């Protein structure tokens, strides 16, 4: 659990635009697999499970990381509120598996390519949270529904 917590705090830092190693600014770059064909398995074109991925690069030190596009959203207050409302503490979880399941099992829908716009929908119990993002993966709309 200690390793998961450290990694999650690094992701929260990156999603907030701060390098978890030196505190400098992080540059965030969105990548979209245009030939994405994954449905439950990794895509043969990009190797990912989702079409949208993100790369993080420190502007000061050698730190870089990346992964699923949703990583850029993990510090969003609406998503954090959604997690805690459903009994999941993203910093000190009772169940790492439950938090991972909620954060990483989401629906992704690309609404437009130019300008880029996509939706990420998270589910917990009988409720959904849909975050709409722009080309910088900044949240431009947030909708919770039962």
Specify the residue positions occupied by each region the protein language model found:
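Long, contiguous alpha-helical scaffold regions
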Residues: 64-146
């Amino acid at each position: 659990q200690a390793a998961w917590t450290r990694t999650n705090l690094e992701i929260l830092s990156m999603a907030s635009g701060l390098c978890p190693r030196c505190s400098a600014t992080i540059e965030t770059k969105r990548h979209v697999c245009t030939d994405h064909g994954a449905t439950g398995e990794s895509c043969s074109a990009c190797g990912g499970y989702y079409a949208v991925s993100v790369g993080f690069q420190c502007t000061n030190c050698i730190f870089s990381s990346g992964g699923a596009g949703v990583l850029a959203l993990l510090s969003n207050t609406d998503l954090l509120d959604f997690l805690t409302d459903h009994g999941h503490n993203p910093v000190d979880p009772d169940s790492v598996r439950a938090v991972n399941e909620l954060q990483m099992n989401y629906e992704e829908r690309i609404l437009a390519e130019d300008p880029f716009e996509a939706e990420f929908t998270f589910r917990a119990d009988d409720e959904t949270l849909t975050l709409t993002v722009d080309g910088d993966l900044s949240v431009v709309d947030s909708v919770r529904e039962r």
